[in-house]
Structures are given as C-alpha cells and as structure tokens.
Amino acid sequence: MSSIREKTIAALDAAEASYRKLAALPLEALTRPDKQALLNRLEELDKKMTALDRRLIGQLVTEGDPALFGGAAWADVLSRRLRISRGEAQRRIAEARSA
C-alpha cells in the first residue's frame, strides 16, 4: 500500500502531465465557443487549486512553528518559499484562516 505522501506526489505528477498535454495543444484551432468553455473549466480548476492551496496553508500555520522553517512569521516563510511578496503571503494566510 502506498503512503499518503506517495499518493500525493503521484497525483501532483499526473496533474502536471495533464497540464503539459493541454498547454501543448493548438488552442488557436478551437472555435470561439470552445475557447469560452475551456476558459470556464480553467477558472473552475483554478478555484479548486486555490482552495487546496489555502487548505495547506491553513494546516501549516495551525500545526507548526515558522521558526522551524527559518522565519519569524509565516508570511516570511511563505514569501521566501513561494517567491511571492510578504503582502501576498499575508493575504493567503488570512484567506486560509477565514476558510
């Protein structure tokens, strides 16, 4: 039986492979309605990915100490690890806490 870590990595690998396949397609060949439908599906997927991101951030900030990751605050850790601004990191943490 695979561990949850292995299953998570396999699922993420599959998602990345699917993205590469989609990105390689000649999207300019789609009709306008097809492009609109694709945009709708991508928006839905983006919302799901954002929700998962906030869930993980919420778990990190409630379960751990940012000092263990080399930061005085979680915003410092996330901004460094994710290469985002400290303000963006604070916004994501606030969203995670309110979810």
Cite the ranges covered by each PLM segment.
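Peripheral, non-cofactor segments flanking catalytic/redox cores
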Residues: M1-A99
